[in-house]
Regions:
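Vicinal oxygen chelate
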Residues: 1-2, 67, 76-125
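N-terminal beta-strand motif that seeds the catalytic metal site of vicinal oxygen chelate
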Residues: 1-18, 62-65, 123-125
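Core segments of cupin and vicinal oxygen chelate
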Residues: 4, 10-48
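Short aromatic/hydrophobic contact patches that present stacked aromatics
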Residues: 8-10, 40, 50, 64-66, ...
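Helix N-cap motif at beta-to-alpha junctions
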Residues: 15-16, 69-73
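Short amphipathic alpha-helices within nucleic acid-binding modules
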Residues: 22, 72-78
Length: 125
């Protein structure tokens, strides 16, 4: 029934203008304004992820978007130059280095937050 369906995902933020600036300028993605006060975030496969305002927004406690990259260090360095702060984890099963990159336990990955506090990641392919 849904085999060839163009499903899409969405998430909430508490400030659409900050989200538009972050995803458009900081992340360098195509962001357009949609109907009913939502943003459309264009992703590489031609799909959109919708970003919608929610007055009582609570940030996701899990990674909502993963951005595959060829070189994790280049991506982390570039995003850091653009003001992104990476999350440093120091837990028994989750440790990152001083740059915020977890290495050697699956793909190299670094987590960070958007202005609404939602968790995102860059991970090395």
């Amino acid at each position: 029934m849904f085999k060839n369906n163009k499903a899409f995902s969405g998430f909430s933020v508490n400030n659409l203008q900050k989200a538009k600036e972050f995803y458009g300028k900081t992340m360098g993605m195509e962001v357009t304004e949609g109907e009913m006060g939502i943003l459309n975030l264009k992703i590489a496969n031609g799909s959109n992820v919708i970003i919608y305002p929610k007055p009582n927004h609570t940030p996701a406690t899990f990674t909502i978007l993963n951005f595959p990259v060829k070189n994790i260090d280049e991506a982390v360095n570039e995003l850091a130059k653009r003001g992104v702060r990476f999350i440093i984890y120091n837990q028994p099963n989750l440790k990152t280095d001083e740059k915020g990159v977890m290495r050697g336990n699956g793909p190299n990955i670094a987590w960070f937050k958007d202005p609404a506090g939602n968790i995102l990641s860059v991970l090395e392919e």
